Design a protein with these regions (language model features):
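Domain-level signal for soluble alpha/beta catalytic cores
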Residues: 1-160
């Protein structure tokens, strides 16, 4: 059953915070959490499994801050984040969906900043294409205070 069918049948529960749990497990101030997709995958897998075992139906991959402005190896970072979450699902033997988690790109859009709307759409489209290729079941766009940036992310998700 796909997620849209399941949403029509019942309430689905997301996991909880990831960053605070990574800090509890050693993430240093200023360290980018997404790097742990490659360097500390076992910790991410354990956290995802804890959420699944607690009843989460949707697990957010550790991709919230992953974009071309922060990572030269973006595809590797996102692919590993999705793979870690999928591995956690498989190891529990339970049904859960994996969300590509998209946060702000970290740049201000014009006129307040320097990023053009079309460029913002392109930044988010790249993330979406990588997440889709890696096997994400859905996209979660969160924690954006600029509605123009949110519009760029939604447009990228719809078109890709």
């Amino acid at each position: 059953m796909n997620i849209l069918d399941e949403l029509g049948r019942r309430i689905l529960f997301f996991d909880g915070g990831l960053g605070s749990l990574l800090q509890e497990r050693g993430l240093e101030p200023g360290e980018l959490p997404e790097t742990w997709n490659l360097t500390r995958p076992e910790i991410l897998i354990d956290i995802h499994k804890e959420y699944i075992n607690a009843g989460a139906d949707i697990i957010n991959a550790n991709t919230f801050g992953a974009n071309r402005f922060k990572f030269d190896n973006l595809e590797e970072i996102i692919t590993a984040g999705i793979a870690n979450a999928k591995k956690a699902v498989a190891e529990t033997g339970k049904k859960a969906y994996v969300a590509l988690d998209i946060g702000s790109c970290g740049k201000l859009l014009k006129p307040m900043g320097t990023l053009d709307f079309a460029d913002a759409v392109d930044v988010f489209a790249e993330i979406v294409r990588i997440g889709d290729k890696a096997g994400a079941d859905l996209i979660l766009i969160e924690t954006m205070s600029d509605t123009y940036e949110l519009k760029a992310a939604v447009l990228a998700a719809k078109e890709n």
